[in-house]
Every structure is written in C-alpha cells, then in structure tokens.
UniProtKB/Swiss-Prot annotation:
Topology versus the membrane: Single-pass type I membrane protein
PANTHER family: LYSOSOME-ASSOCIATED MEMBRANE GLYCOPROTEIN (PTHR11506), LYSOSOME-ASSOCIATED MEMBRANE GLYCOPROTEIN 5 (PTHR11506:SF35)
Region annotated First lumenal domain, chain positions: 22-189
Positions of glycan attachment: 32, 40, 57, 72, 79, 98, 102, 116, 125, 145, 160, 178, 215, 220, 233, 241, 253, 283, 297, 304, 312
Record field: transmembrane: 372-395
Protein name (Swiss-Prot/TrEMBL): Lysosome-associated membrane glycoprotein 1
C-alpha cells in the first residue's frame, strides 16, 4: 500500500510543476567561467504567417530544451562590445537579448527573434519557407547592480511577431556571478514594495484609468468601436536634471475624434497638454486589423525640453480578424519609445468593419487564455491525485484481505 505521506508529496510536486515548469534559467559566462548575464523567465511566441488561403496565427512556448547558444552569446568587452544572450531551440529558432548601459542603468536595448517557416509543426502550409527574423527595442531596464524583476507579462511587438516574457528575472553586468538581492521592478508591476516616495510627491503610479467608450464614424458609417482605459508612461528630464517617470491617465473629459480611410483608421485623444494618436491598419490580405502606430505630442512645463514627440509606426498590437472584435481584460503594455509607453486596460476594440454599431464576435487575447489555464490545470491535477489515492487505497485493501485467506 502507498505510504501515508505519498499523496501529499505527489500533490506538492504536481503544483510545483504547474507553477514553475515553463520557466528556465539561462546563464552567460566569460572565458574564466564567471557569470555576466543571468535570466530566468518563461516565454511564448505569437506569430502571423501567410498561407495560400490567407493569414494564420501560430502560438508556441519556449520549450524546456532551450539553451544558451554560447557561440552567439558574450559578456562583451568594455568600450568595444556589449553583453549578448542568445537562446536557441528547435530547428533554427533564436531569441537574442542585446544589453547596453550608461552610468546608472542597464537595459535590453534590442530583442531579436529568428523563426523557421519550414517548421510544419508551428507553420503548417506556410507560403514562405526558411529562416525569418524580426527585432525591436524594449523597455526592459533596471538600475546598475540591481536585478530586473517583473511578475507581469512583458510583451514585445516585432512586426508580425509578439514575444511575451512571464515571471522574468534578468540581470546583466553581474558583480558576484549571481542575481542581486536588490531589485528594480517593471512598470507593469507598479512601484517596488520597498520604495516609499517622499510625502509631498504624488504617487508614481496613479489608480487605474477609467474605461472610456470611443466611436469613430466616416462617410460609410462607423469604422472604429472601442471600450478601453488608457495610461501614458512618460520618462523625461526635469529642469533640475532629475529624470522622472510619470503615469498619466487618459480622462473621460479629454476630447476624442478620428478619421476613416480604406486602409487606416485613426483615433485621436486630445487634452490640455497632449495629443495622442492611435492608428489601426490591416495586413496585406485585409483579413486582420491591428494597432500599427502610436504617436504622442506633449507639452511638459517642468521638463528641460518642454515638448515631447514620440512615435512608433511598426506595432502589431490589439489584433483580430476584420469583422470581429479584440478583447483583453489583462493589462497590456505597449512600448513606443524609450521615453513613452502606453498601458491599455480592459480593452475591446474593432476597426474597419463594424456592423450596426455593435462589437462582432470576440477574439480574446493570449494572456486571458493563459490565466484560465492555471485553474483548469490545477483542477485536473487534483482530480488525477484523487484517482491515484483511490487506486492505492483499493490495492492496499485487496492486499489486506488476502492476508486473512484460509490456508
């Protein structure tokens, strides 16, 4: 019969596997065996590719077999090159993080992803074949000699690919070949629990913004329907040469307008000090819509440079099939430039084709789907555990009865 402690131990193992099975530790070392980069995270990849019958989506995870590609990774050389972490998996897949630093901070300046369209496991019936690559800057950054920590999902949009890092712990330019105990928390997590701003200062992260409904109408009717809450993260240098990051909520009192055209739908939100443009586009076959550009013009009265202009025209966020609506309850963080990023909360949006001023069929974001998988997986594990304990009990009972048989 099973030992009394076995079911409890089995349950702990099952839950531990569910919580940490997807994460992996990647370490880059110099020629002396000293670690200079450490990264621990799980990753998922959302890719749009073309087939003979239009666009298709492919979603896959960073496998447990992924490992550091030492030939492409490096600790860098001072004043010559910067540290690089390259992770290899599958047949030709590469995820590369290029680091850089200044006097006070280090960052992942660029993320590069190479994928293999000849891999039929992930890209069935792809029109194009071979290795393709995309890259983008990121807002992964931390103070020197501190660990970058982010419990929230980090999304990096790279053209037709979105890379999502989860439960990330990253540090480059290591001092003692290990993660620092001091952390810099990502903006998605909010301020660090140990960070207490001076009492006269307003909090760095305000309450969540209000969900606002937007409607853009053209000559042929409604071309954009949206319900979402928006928050702008602005980093700038004040007149006293102090660098600050502020989170500013879009208010229901701000003026909203927009325009419709066959290939671009624009939503403009204007306040006293800022003009925010969100531009939606379509893919080549006009089967998908997505947020392709975010542009901000802002006046900053207390800044060294009083005006801020930021734009990114190569985004691929908030994407769904034309005629359907994109919906995501999870907060999304859209990186625009190193000075500006946009947080989107509780979003539902539909562009180009809107029937009867109502949202079409819903396409949920990957993050919401992942959140549902955890309770389902835990429930499945517990059900399996109950079955195992029941079988062990019945086997033990049968053996006990066998011991009393007449000889």
């Amino acid at each position: 019969m099973a030992a009394p402690g076995a079911p409890r131990s089995l349950l702990l193992l099952l839950l531990a596997g569910l919580a940490h099975g997807a994460s992996a530790l990647f370490v880059v070392k110099d020629s002396n065996g000293t670690a200079c980069i450490m990264a621990n995270f799980s990753a998922s990849f959302f890719t749009i590719y073309e087939t003979g019958h239009g666009s298709k989506n492919s979603t896959f995870e960073l496998p447990s077999s992924a490992e550091v590609l030492n030939s492409n990774s490096s600790c860098g050389r001072e004043n010559v090159s910067e540290p690089i972490l390259t992770i290899a998996f599958g047949s030709g897949y590469l995820l590369t993080l290029n680091f850089t630093r200044n006097a006070t901070r280090y960052s992942v300046q660029d993320m590069y992803f190479a994928y293999n369209l000849s891999d039929t496991q992930h890209f069935l019936n792809a029109s194009n074949k071979g290795i393709h690559s995309v890259d983008s800057s990121t807002d992964i950054k931390a103070d020197i000699n501190k660990t970058y920590r982010c419990l929230s999902a980090i999304q990096v949009h790279m053209g037709n690919v979105t890379v999502t890092l989860s439960d990330a712990t990253i540090q480059a330019y290591l001092l003692n070949s290990n993660f620092s105990k001091e952390e810099t928390r990502c903006t998605q997590d909010g301020p660090s629990p140990t960070t207490v701003p001076p009492s006269p200062s307003p909090p760095l992260v305000p309450t969540n913004p209000t969900v606002i409904k937007y409607n853009v109408t053209g000559e042929n009717g409604t071309c954009l329907l949206a319900s979402m809450a928006l928050q702008m993260n602005i980093t700038y240098m004040k007149k006293d040469n102090m660098t600050v990051t502020r989170a500013l909520n879009i208010s229901p009192n701000d003026t909203a307008s927009g325009s419709c055209s066959p290939h671009v739908v624009t939503l403009t939100v204007e306040s006293k000090n800022s003009i925010l443009d969100l531009k939606f586009g379509m893919n080549g076959s006009s089967s998908l819509f997505f947020l392709q550009e975010v542009r901000l013009n802002m006046t900053l009265p207390d800044a060294n440079v009083s005006s801020l202009m930021a734009s990114n025209q190569s985004l691929r966020a908030l994407q769904a099939t034309v005629g359907n609506s994109y919906k995501c309850n999870t907060e999304e963080h859209i990186f625009v430039t190193k000075e500006f990023s946009l947080n989107v909360f509780s979003v539902q949006v539909q562009a180009f084709k809107v029937e009867s001023d109502r949202f079409g069929s819903v396409e949920e974001c990957m993050q919401d789907g992942n959140n549902m998988l955890i309770p389902i997986a835990v429930g499945g594990a517990l059900a399996g555990l109950v079955l195992i304990v029941l079988i062990a009990y019945l086997i033990g009972r049968k053996r006990s009865h066998a011991g009393y048989q007449t000889i």
